[in-house]
């Protein structure tokens, strides 16, 4: 039982517990008590002790010199003592823990893996032989400041010298104050100096940190301590180390002299940091060290005069792990990122990257978060010394990029968004990588949006421009501006829903003209003409579009099914501007020209009605699937759609395309995306879906199949396509559309789509994907997929027409000779993709991917290698082959170049990656489930 000391604490913060031996001042200082006392401070400042029941004989007062490390007390009749061997110094351990203190390293709270609980195993690393588990103790969660907290003391024996004001304790000595606890074999507490000396098996515990040593000095009023021959453990961070001595400051900061730091297990020193002065700050979660060597198996491999490293997952300013690499275009590269932890709600990162062939790329980003907004601002600049592209069109040697992504809620209904990126030249992302998270597609967005959400409507103002990030695409239309208002009336007379959709948008763009200059300075040839300059007729138009779409429907829903009849009217008004070349193309008298018979109208319009009837039923029954109890559903659906034909050949195509056919196409009101074409339809779509659902809600299997029956040809097509030349536009039926999903369990999944053309007796498109990744062992990943698609409707940049032809160019030139630039099946998709990460042995895993294009008989990407993973470090070595897209010509056949590389990644857990961080990029992009694997890994 602890006795709490009141006002006396300020002078000498000592509280004496049961089993503590104390001597009254009246006794001789050389006598020994044969009974125990409960003591507390008297009103005069002395001790007031009451005797307890007699117990067994206590050992005599320990006799030791001030410099002694530890002395073993014998019985009262002992006449001689045996000299103990000198302790092993931590400097002799070479990064390992001292087995001399405990062969099983239990002195560091190390618990073997087979003795961990299920919860502790979940927190431990997958390849760790155990974990540091802090034992429960009184007051471990106490956050009271030391100067406001009493001290509790317990020991098997004690002695107090009134004249010197020294209390001597022996046997399982424990001092506890607030959340800090110190243990030792022996202790001397000096009341006048408010300090203590502890000897033998010293343990200091505080805020998830344990420091073990042979001898310690403790300042009793503020918790400052020095522990000699020290080892330490930080339980949550799973790190340990040692030092000639360790100092604990009043602020709980730990300073180590000749200290080490590692995340490796106590008996392992695969790697560790060693520095003259090491500082660990649990309050900030970071440490620093000076004159540091990184040692692998005690061999120094790296030196730095200063290092700043994390000891937990909190953010803090400092250098992030560097990245080294080589490439044919950049040469040797070194990136040394620096992170600025400016405030809890905003930070910044600088990414200086030195490239031997190009120079120094300075890239950085600033991120922010407020109660109503979030976003990031980034930028980069490089004075490019690589002159390979200096003759190419639109190239700039002063390379730059800046971006701003922002979201802000102006109130509960109004949302503002910005996504703006600009680049110096269209080759920027082909030559340079970015760490700012910008999606490097064929263009970058320059968009600002205001969205207002009412109770029954949504209004949006959008300003959207594009900056091309390549030279082989046609300049897209900017929407400057786009205004939409969609919703329904707030009343429902007779159960009717009155809906409306409105849009106004202005389309504008600046077309390139003239000829492209390639990297050799060659230009002026027909194939060098910019694709923008090859546009003809209405494809060169810009203008404005106003679209109105009122509708009324009667949704009827029951537990067993639904019926929804709907009527709409779609009206679109245009204001079209066309340059002289476009008007001249429309005036052609050539019947073979796609613009023959098309008149230029400055204000074309279109109005067309739409009727649809959607209906479905729902049935279910209890059944079994492979011995499992399930509820099977049967959900037939019928959808009738009628849209009359309206001639739309005089309307330009601004933002419209034709999506590829799928099961979802059966239920669409318009087979085109965008509003420049409203497809004529007179069809009935029939489909059925069946699901197998287990009692816990797990969907084991799902199967859908459907087909559309056409009563009229689909005459409305994209510009340049004659419906009479498209078999699928004149067929009476659509392809059979199938979708299938089966989950073998929560880890195994198989999904497939399949579209079969009954007229051609051929597959239009299909896919099959197998994915395996166990929840309880995400280190295992298997992906096997196949995709086939031969029904893509695309705009052919070379000919300037819409087409379904999958080839690039024509097989022959105008003179009948073979076309050297012709590429068969260039746009056809016929690929398999296989990837795997699989453990071969404990700690060893195979990593591989193979993506192959059957249409062009070539490997798109292939890599293979291995991974070694231990408790404290990881290594990956991967050999990779891939197709690199680097635009040097308008001819796609010259822009695909194979490349190869061997990639090494080393990760020192607790420090981050040392080399090869870029390996993460292609593993994340190439292997489904890789990110989940890394996120769930310890």
From Swiss-Prot:
Residues 65-81 have a biased composition (Low complexity). It holds the Pfam family LptD. Residues 1-33 form the signal peptide. The keyword Electron transport does not apply. One of its GO terms (cellular component) is transporter complex. It is found in: Cell outer membrane. Together with LptE, is involved in the assembly of lipopolysaccharide (LPS) at the surface of the outer membrane. PANTHER family: LPS-ASSEMBLY PROTEIN (PTHR30189), LPS-ASSEMBLY PROTEIN LPTD (PTHR30189:SF1). This is LPS-assembly protein LptD. The lineage of its organism: Bacteria, Pseudomonadati, Pseudomonadota, Gammaproteobacteria, Pseudomonadales.
